[in-house]
Amino acid sequence: MKKGCTPTISIALDKPNDLGARLLAVRHETRWNGAGIIIQIPEDWRARDSALLWIALTGIDAPVAIVTLAEHADSIAIHAPEEPMTVALGRPDLVRRAQLWQTLLPDGVLSAGDRDELAARYEFSPRAISRTIRRAAVDRIGKAELHAAARAIGSANISTIAQPLPLVYTRDDLVLPPRMLGELDLAIAWIRYKRKIYDTWGFGRRIALGRGLTALFAGPPGTGKTMTAQVLARDLGLDLYRVDLSRVMSKYIGETEKNLSKLFDEAQASGAALLFDEADALFGKRSESRDAHDRYANLEIGYLLQRMEEHEGVAILATNRVGDLDEAFLRRFHFLLDFPMPDASYRLRLWNGMLPREVDRAPDLDLGPLAATYELSGGEIRNCVLAAAYMAAAEGTCVRIDHLERGLRRELGKTGRIVVAPRRRSVEEEV
């Protein structure tokens, strides 16, 4: 041991009830050699365990350092017999992250630009950067391997509160008006060229908040909101997570804010995109404060607005009822995309697009009358086509119009609608 260094004893605490026995075992050593004690608090620490922690430390004369996540610091400090000294350690900034990538990566693996891209996309701690490099090195290490490893490392925590969505769709799968496709292109550029805008072109000196991408996708069910979010994330090379609002909202005061804080922190660190599906459940019109419950609900929404404005990643909100969102909330979004029900020409594209090229179609299969007659969303058309394909496969035949009509009856029956005889005129006449 170097002269002047204080010896330390590290205790990785699993259960608060174990601390008394663990301290008793090291008490003699701390008195004999003046060792300090480092107590590592687990991630699943409960606030009520903090009182037990300080009871167990009663009578310990050695210096004690408690290492914990920021979310547990307040509860531990509140129960302390006297005000403890608190040192907050944040994640390294962009410059430091770039230096860490450069130091830890072997020479010649990545260009300086690629290293800077990793540093900008993933707000990792030094430990997470090291784990990413080790994980990528299992195979041939390179840019693609490092990004894949970084996404895997970063998603470990966020996947506990949100559901990863597969990114199987491409831009060719979208059937949307040209104006909406143009907005999608701009949304992709919003993230792809963020560093150029804020760093190279100097907008960072003028704009402190709202540097991320916040988008509201509004429209009836099945009109392509989730698919568009998946295409956007895929084009940007980001993982996409759908937020389960039932796991975010809580009846206990302060818990919803805590859940939202964890969600945004993990998404920011991992570079993942967030999709709040059916968001009207959480983001409804703010009420006038008539009682304590209303005031608390407004505080929750206010905190969400604050985190969205501070977030530098991608946050997409999908709702079926845009009218339930007030103007103050709408102003926080960079993009407002209204997904309409498809007209006859778009419905024909959807009917044709839902049938893969590999499907064996009947030679006389005419989808025009179905598209012209039935006002369906893309999701409903998908369900009709899929049911028809199963019927044809079960019969050992090609897909015929009667299969599609039977699939159509099943789909319309879900909402009590009636199948009428298809119009035998072209879609061009319809539009």
For each of these PLM feature ranges, what is it?
Residues 8, 29-44, 61:
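Hydrophobic/aromatic interaction determinants used to assemble and anchor large protein complexes
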Residues 12-16, 37, 41-48, 71-73:
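Short acidic, S/G/P-rich loop/turn micro-motifs used as interaction or catalytic elements
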Residues 1-15, 23-25, 62-285, 290-431:
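AAA+ P-loop ATPase motor domain of ring mechanoenzymes
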Residues 21-24, 44-59, 300, 304:
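Conserved Walker B catalytic segment
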